[in-house]
Each structure stands twice: as C-alpha cells, then as structure tokens.
Amino acid sequence: YRFAPGYETEDFDSVLDWAAWPGAAGGFQGAVEMCNNNGACRKLSGGVMCPSYRPTRNERDAVRGRANSLRLAMSGQLGPDAMASDAMAETMKLCVSCKACKRECPVGVDMARMKVEVTAARAAKHGIPLHDRLIGNLPAYAPLASGLSGLSNLVQSVWRHVPGLASLVSRLTGFT
C-alpha cells in the first residue's frame, strides 16, 4: 500500500486552484497523491525527466521523492508547519520548474506547480528572502543601478581586499 492504514491529510490552504485534480483527498492533496511511485522520474536517459535527479541520483531530487516528502508533510508525519520548513525547501530547491514531470510522468504529476505551494507556504511563514526580493524588483532599480556602474566596480575591487566582506555580503543578500 502507498498509504498506511489510517492515513489522512491535514487541511492545507493552497494558493493555486487545484479543483481539476483528481485523487482521494482532492485538491492539492489529491494532486500530490497522484504520484503512484512508478519511478518514471528516475530514468537516466531519453526524454527530459527529471533534470535535477539525473546528476545527483538522489531519491530526494526525483519527482517521486519530492511527492513522498509532500505526502509526509501533508499527513503531519514531519511535524507542524512542515510545508514551510527548511527541510521541505531543501527538498524542492533543485526543482527547476521545467514541467518535464507533467509531460512525461504516466500520471501527469506537476511538481513545478506543487513547488509554488511550498514556496508560498514558506513565504507566508518566514517572509520573502532578500535575495528573492532583489531579483523580483530588479526592473524597478535596474536603471538606477546601471548609472552607478563605476561605484559598483569600485566596491567590488575594494571588497576583494577586505577579509570577510565578500562572504558577509553574500550571506546578507544570498548572492555568491
């Protein structure tokens, strides 16, 4: 059995509309439960699925591994707020949202769409990281930044000579 006796999912407020997805639980939970562990996401040649699993060959980086992690989180087996946890973010980190899973999975699991839910749950609990806000607002400040290229070049040349400054800026902004 894929589910232990007494398996139930906890309520989850999704940000996307999952009404069209089948499954015993329906909605987002039903979409996650569509993964039947057939392992098509673990193929190493032919097709495109799953580009993050192929180099790592780590089950966590396969669509099936991510779906199983979501299933554990939804059923409360990973503790409270598991959808917004660091562990869940790490599980989803290498998903490149290419949607190869949706195209090539025999049951059409759409992990890119599920990643949106995890990202939204994490943002609701912890806020949006500075790195993501900087990238998201790039169009707003890009014209100003382009005018400050000389200052930027000066700062970059200085911080190479100040021990620890580059790593501090990297930790603060999330850029390496």
Predicted regions and their residues:
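Flexible inter-domain linker/hinge segments
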Residues: 1-51, 57-61, 70-74, 153, ...
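Non-heme iron-sulfur electron-transfer modules
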Residues: 1-9, 46-87, 108-133
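Short Cys/His-rich local motifs and their 1-3 flanking residues in nucleic-acid-associated proteins
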Residues: 37-40, 52-55, 97-103, 107
